[in-house]
Regions:
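Flexible loop/hinge segments at secondary-structure junctions
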Residues: 1-267
């Protein structure tokens, strides 16, 4: 079994098939959100997808000649938009191997990228260039890779109060005495906004089970039965206390049925 902070891709599933793992069970466990958190000792920030993209992209359109792309020149937030504070751009986050990084890029960077006309025009005409521009994060020190342990980011944000940190919502929720989340297009990351999918950076969480192991490893069926019970992942389930935002009742019923019937995964 493996848990994932995004859905498996077609390429990853094909890699499983190529290695003899053709039968998987997919269970959507619930929801989480990606947040840009920072210290409570500084004023709160309100950001848009476009501002986030312009702060962290490796290359952006040249303001003087938008058809040309240049290395990201921005060093302070107010250079992007004068409504933003005059503080150095510093964002701590996970490495490329992280599912949280993938989610951050797809939910925030790419959406912001598409709001820039000269880049959006490349989506159909030059898809490879479009993907590179939208998905590449700058490497000049404005983005600081801090590993895949969100607790380290929490600790570093206390020491660097003007920096932002890319975290899962549950880590923000567990550290609200020290941290606050940036508004995203005017919406705060909280239980209600993520559950209602009003917060743009909400993401589903998954569990994948290798079917061929089930007959030989005791307890997997029982584990799936318990995991998909209302006492575990429901509105009052104990996973909510750990930061999970439950899926809708309809989704929970559908994925419990899939889990108990060991339904084959399909894209």
């Amino acid at each position: 079994m493996v848990s994932a902070s995004r859905r498996i891709t077609a390429g990853e599933f094909q890699q499983c098939v190529d290695n003899g793992v053709a039968e998987l069970v997919e269970i959507k466990i619930g929801y989480d959100g990606i947040v840009l958190a920072h210290s409570k000792n500084v004023p709160p920030m309100s950001l848009t997808n476009k501002q986030i993209y312009l702060a962290l992209a490796g290359k952006i359109p040249n303001p003087a000649a938008p058809e040309q792309f240049i290395d990201n020149p921005y060093t302070s937030w107010n250079e992007i938009d004068d409504s933003l504070p005059k503080i150095k751009i510093g964002v701590m986050g996970p490495p490329p191997s992280s599912g949280t990084r993938d989610a951050f890029v797809s939910l925030l960077m790419e959406k912001g990228c598409e709001q820039i006309p000269t880049i959006a025009a490349l989506k159909q005409a030059k898809r490879s260039q479009f993907d590179t521009l939208c998905q590449s994060i700058r490497s000049d020190g404005a983005y600081i890779e801090t590993g895949e342990n969100d607790n380290i980011i929490v600790q570093k944000l206390e020491m660097n109060p003007t920096d932002l940190g890319i975290l899962g919502y549950n880590f923000l929720d567990q550290n609200r005495d020290k941290l606050q989340g940036s508004l995203l297009d005017g919406v705060a990351a909280d239980y209600k906004s993520i559950a209602a999918r009003q917060y743009e950076a909400a993401r589903p969480l998954y569990l994948y089970v290798k079917k061929s192991h089930i007959p030989f490893i005791p307890g997997i069926n029982e584990f799936l039965y318990d995991l998909t019970s209302e006492e575990t992942w429901g509105e009052e389930g104990y996973l909510r206390e750990k930061g999970l935002i439950p899926a809708s009742q309809q989704e929970r019923q559908e994925f419990r049925k899939d889990a108990l019937l060991l339904k084959d995964f399909t894209l």
